[in-house]
Amino acid sequence: MSNKILVVGAGFSGAVIARMLSEQGYLVDMIDKRDHIAGNAFDYHNAHNILVHQYGPHLFHTNNRSVFEFLSRFTEWVDYQHRVKAILEDGSLVTLPVNLETKDRVGEDKVIDTFIRPYSEKMWGLKLEEISPDIINRVPIRNDLNELYFPNDEFQAMPKAGYTALFEKMLQHPTIQVKLGTHFQKEMEADYAHVFNSMPIDEYYDYCLGPLPYRSLKFHHVDLPIPRIFPVCQVNFTNDGPYTRVVEWKNIPNSPQNPQYTSLTYEEPCSYTENNNERFYPVKDASGKNRELYLAYKAMENPKTTFIGRLGQYVYLDMHQVVSSSMAIAEKFLKENPL
């Protein structure tokens, strides 16, 4: 049996699988259409030496010790407990997720229409009633005064040198070869024993059953010659403007602190067709039709290909869930295909 593996996509799903297989003797070729590794977790130091996440904030949190220990092989950590504020019409800030203090400020009867409806409808391009409750319930409404966004997760931290540095170490292995700026072609499959593919599954099958709906994001990066604007990293908007939230990067403690400048990123949701076909989020609708279409594509999967990640599996996953899922996929493959 050949021990050559192709991994399509250099994000978390692909990198975890590549590392685990390479450590068991497989020769792994990794390709990515972008010009960088780390997928949507890619970060970089901008002109003011502030650490910016190119594709929006990636905040690591989990209760899964095995995930934390696996990633800890490739990074040191800086403790960080995420806090979020929402800006009201009068410019004042209140805590999210909604807690007792926030409910007292705006009135309990206005919580849904102030915080949940405008953000969710902009994010998903659907009316609130059309969005799956699973998505809506990701942001709870609390009956206490807790201000932590992830109050129940044991491990909450940021990679000390950033995510890109973490990926560089994870992919630094003699049997992993990475080629960037390289698009997947089906003809490549013939050279490999197996392919782990993180591309959109409907695109792989040339949309033969119809396109799967995805949402995208446009990121507007801004540098300002002032020390700081907000007391927290993330501020959500409650108005009907185009943006869902703004992130002030120096409020994440693994970023260098420039006393003269601050850097912000505004997020504007849109259809992926309006953003160079950049897909970020599978759309989980209340009717379940999108899931049914994905399963029809999934049924076409051939034994030499495994679809991975958010786009390949058409599922909304946090980082720790992507890592856990990818570890399980790699372990299953290694058990069934020992060298």
Spans of features found by a protein language model:
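N-terminal Rossmann-like FAD-binding beta1-loop-alpha1 element of flavoenzymes
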Residues: 3-30
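Short N-terminal binding/cap micro-motifs at the start of the first secondary-structure element
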Residues: 14-15, 37-40, 316
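Glycine-rich FAD pyrophosphate-binding loop
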Residues: 22-47
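Active-site/ligand-binding neighborhood in enzyme catalytic cores
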Residues: 90-194, 198-207
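C-terminal segments that line or cap access tunnels to active or ligand-binding sites in enzymes
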Residues: 192, 203-339
